[in-house]
Amino acid sequence: MEIKYRPEELTKLPRSVEYREGKVYMINQRLLPREFKVEEFTTVEAVAEAIKNMTVRGAPAIGAAAAFGLALYAETSKAKTKDEFFDGFYRAYETLKNTRPTAVNLFWALNRIKKLVEEHREDSLDEIKRLIVEEAQKIADEDVEANLRMGHYGAEVLPEGNILTHCNAGSLATVHLGTVGAVVRVMHKEGTLKLLWLDETRPVLQGARLSAWEYSYDGLNVKLIADNAAAFVMQQGKVDAIIVGADRIVANGDFANKIGTYMLAVLAKEHGIPFFTVAPLSSIDMSLSSGKEIPIEERSPEEVLTCGGCRIAPDVPVYNPAFDVTPHKYLTGIITDRGVVWPPFKRNLKKLFETL
């Protein structure tokens, strides 16, 4: 597969997560679209809180943010001995690990650095610190390259026409470009994307606040709809394919993504519309056999009871799962950075990982 475009040809946005000179920099996604602000983080605790409160969100983005949190610890640690350094490292690791439970990239990135540290325990302290920072940067850079490949793979298999997406799996949800974001940007560049339908994505409105902002910023033709309008738009024949991100894909092809994804998958099947998820290999968890095993985060009732800081409902009990699980039977294909995986997913995902 030929890479035709570089990131700077596809988006004007900067990276959503960066690390420079002992500081983590992240676009504050809670402020968008009212204000674009890159904030600076100087402690592991501050990075962890940013992941928890969704200043940074999106599975690949929080994976990179967590990795940079460990880099930040390494560069700012005042430990005099290796034992002292390792004690602090494992505390930082646990602090970051305990932020959000569903997105597997978080654990993948943290465990990758932890494994590296344990393999180099006998090296000098300075060398261990250097390796941590270098590995965190590699994780971020690899994410951008993976997105670029997914963008090209996805553009090859999606039909020309109108695409519907849910939540935000764009540049803001990754280090740069996005998963879905890379696909629709390559399609836009090649003239095959006619219209990008955006679900508003209640209760936090990532589709309305973030996707609408970033895709219109890059000049894509977008149209925003209420979540409960999706079925009618499909019924009218105005959707040619649906593409969504994934926070965790398991061995049989079931996947967790933003709440409301499962609903779209069922509707797509009813209306005969191709339904794809797109995610890097770091989002695939082969240790789980089915989606029933994925831990689902529940968030504050306030996200449902309020909108933009204004109360919109009486003080009643709320059930607020942040994600749902889509069974693999609804999937047309899984677009990864190593190509498109087609059914049967259990066999073909296993085969994909055996070739790595």
Curated annotation (Swiss-Prot):
Range of residues in the leader sequence: none
Binding sites annotated in the UniProt record for substrate: 57-59, 100, 206, 257-258
Keyword Isomerase tagged: yes
Pfam families the record matches: IF-2B
Keywords: Amino-acid biosynthesis, Isomerase, Methionine biosynthesis
Gene Ontology BP annotations: L-methionine salvage from methylthioadenosine
Site (Transition state stabilizer): 167
Active-site residue numbers: 247 (proton donor)
Catalytic activity: 5-(methylsulfanyl)-alpha-D-ribose 1-phosphate = 5-(methylsulfanyl)-D-ribulose 1-phosphate
Enzymatic class: isomerase
GO molecular function terms listed in the Swiss-Prot or TrEMBL record: S-methyl-5-thioribose-1-phosphate isomerase activity
Entry's EC annotation: 5.3.1.23
Family membership noted in the UniProt record: Belongs to the eIF-2B alpha/beta/delta subunits family. MtnA subfamily.
Protein role: Catalyzes the interconversion of methylthioribose-1-phosphate (MTR-1-P) into methylthioribulose-1-phosphate (MTRu-1-P).
Name assigned to this protein: Putative methylthioribose-1-phosphate isomerase
Lineage: Archaea, Methanobacteriati, Methanobacteriota, Thermococci, Thermococcales
